[in-house]
């Protein structure tokens, strides 16, 4: 399995960039704006609602991206990635617009509070509170409460999986894209892709240390360790050249063994951050087309 030409070109551009794990939190947050250079033009959507939703300790900025059509809309609660530490809704704007248009779902994106200032369980508690808010206020935002699911990429995939564990009886589906699901750096993907693939094993150690803080590893922090019986149908997407690849693969296998309907999709030639690189990597747009079909079959 080799890196495809598009991913190789990205890696060449990233060569020589400062190691994230040697950065301060401020430096890492500033560096994440570099993703914008790899993104395509933002698509128009029918409308975007900007709002704040109450979290347990703070009001949380949120947006709802609406596709064309008449509601009430099925909805995706989207929890963004970047290690529980960095990124925001502005950096994900292009991806969120495309998600709404491709799937025909309203996309409810939440800017949860970040570690290390707000370590576990704060980002998860924020995510759960925002999800509960959408169920409670679905009618007022033109959403069908019977068709709400959760989605996230990377650290957001971790949060989405944990939200599904806590709200398994309410959610219609879960979509986990390149999810980081356990604190186990001995897997083959962590060893084989320790360096040189846009996300390093040491960077993941840095992210996990900030997220966990002084908390012990629990099933909600590391959903791969949780019981998964009765969870909603899942779509798990992984990248072939990604330290966290095996997390998603193992979780999909665990879901299947528990009788949860699951589709595992491996984009074998690409790298971890493809959701934020749609201007130079094809995989996110391919994923959106497949998600549209999968969601239509539920």
Q: Which residues fall in each region the model found?
A:
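Gly/Ala-rich beta-loop-alpha elbow adjacent to hydrolase catalytic centers
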Residues: 152, 156, 160
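Hydrolase active-site cap/lid region
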Residues: 165-215
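Short amphipathic alpha-helix adjacent to the substrate-entry channel of hydrolases
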Residues: 90-110
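Catalytic active-site module of serine/aspartate enzymes centered on a nucleophile-bearing elbow/loop
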Residues: 279-298
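A glycine/proline-hinged amphipathic helix-loop "lid/cap" segment
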Residues: 1-64, 296
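Short beta-strand element of the alpha/beta-hydrolase
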Residues: 72-82
